[in-house]
Amino acid sequence: MKIKALSKLKPEEGIWMNEVDKPEMGHNDLLIRIKKTAICGTDVHIYNWDEWSQKTIPVPMVVGHEYVGEVVGIGQEVRGFTIGDRVSGEGHITCGHCRNCRGGRTHLCRNTTGVGVNRDGAFAEFLVIPAFNAFKIPAGISDDLASIFDPFGNAVHTALSFDLVGEDVLITGAGPIGIMAAAVAKHVGARHVVITDVNEYRLDLARKMGVTRAVNVANEKLEDVMSELGMTEGFDVGLEMSGVPSAFNGMLASMNHGGKVALLGIPPSDMAVDWTQVIFKGLVIKGIYGREMFETWYKMASLIQSGLDLTPIITHHYKIDDFQKGFDMMRSGMSGKVILDWE
């Protein structure tokens, strides 16, 4: 049986709609009928066919890894799922036999493969993944929100890396993940949450999500904002979401002594860092990749159930046949999360 999918078909700019074979389920897998998918920044990289994509992405391949769907098939070894369960899923498929997997630190698996990055992804009518990777969506959480659990998980993993209660938090990069991280920080009790970017549309989105200050660093100085807020000692926690070298070095300069920094944004490989800031301030730096399995997923559900409102971050919806409009909108930078509806 053939199904509709969005695939990287050629080693050049673009993503195309095509027909592929319906994926076959193994003994430990679930077959999921996709309801909604969201476009990730990674999908935009794949669309643009940048240097990272050229080195990483096999062609042809079905792309996409942010989704919500319904279980329609269950492998014979699988327990704990029933037909009709609403699920999203962890996009990092791990080996299960390396030291970190066996030690319960699966997010640090050295043999990780990515759904929609190294193997066929979720931008299709059906997806097969190991049942281990599926996460049941609690009742009361909408399909829209469930479809963005993957990037929300990046935000939660990064934001909750350090204690935020009563702390001053600086977030560099107001993409959807940075904005969601800011909302999490506010929700769990940070004092001042300041986010920086040069994209005024996204800074406005951050303001709607309740940040203390959204700062356009093209025309406002961070130190002025700090003194306006009565901050005399620098930020306690930094969350770097942009991958922009000047943003990271500006963050290091703005941190308090003993501050803690989590890095999610991927910088150029030759980024220069002012290491004296790190050494003399005694900063702690932590790299973040993906989500903790599955601690982050349970935290995400609990945060939404406890009143965290992420709905403003979802700005655009398109039918799957209008996927090109969705990608154009994401590439313009004038959007939050863009959702594609498969039903």
Swiss-Prot record:
Binding site for Zn(2+) 2: C95, C98, C101, C109
Binding site for Zn(2+) 1: C40, H65, E66
Active site: T42, H45
Pathway: Amino-acid degradation; L-threonine degradation via oxydo-reductase pathway; glycine from L-threonine: step 1/2
Record-linked Pfam families: ADH_N, ADH_zinc_N
Single GO molecular function: zinc ion binding
Catalysed reactions, semicolon-separated: L-threonine + NAD(+) = (2S)-2-amino-3-oxobutanoate + NADH + H(+)
Cofactor: record remark: Binds 2 Zn(2+) ions per subunit.
Gene3D superfamilies the record matches: Medium-chain alcohol dehydrogenases, catalytic domain, NAD(P)-binding Rossmann-like Domain
The enzyme's E.C. designation: 1.1.1.103
Enzyme class, broadest EC rank: oxidoreductase
Cofactor list: Zn(2+)
Cellular compartments annotated: Cytoplasm
InterPro entries hit by this protein: ADH-like_C, ADH-like_N, ADH_Zn_CS, GroES-like_sf, L-Threonine_3-DHase, NAD(P)-bd_dom_sf, PKS_ER, Zn_alcohol_dh
Primary location class: cytoplasm
Residues the entry annotates as binding NAD(+): I177, D197, R202, L264, G265, I266, I288, Y289
Subunit organization: Homotetramer.
Family, similarity comment: Belongs to the zinc-containing alcohol dehydrogenase family.
Biological role stated in the UniProt entry: Catalyzes the NAD(+)-dependent oxidation of L-threonine to 2-amino-3-ketobutyrate.
Protein name per Swiss-Prot or TrEMBL: L-threonine 3-dehydrogenase
Organism lineage: Bacteria, Pseudomonadati, Pseudomonadota, Gammaproteobacteria, Vibrionales
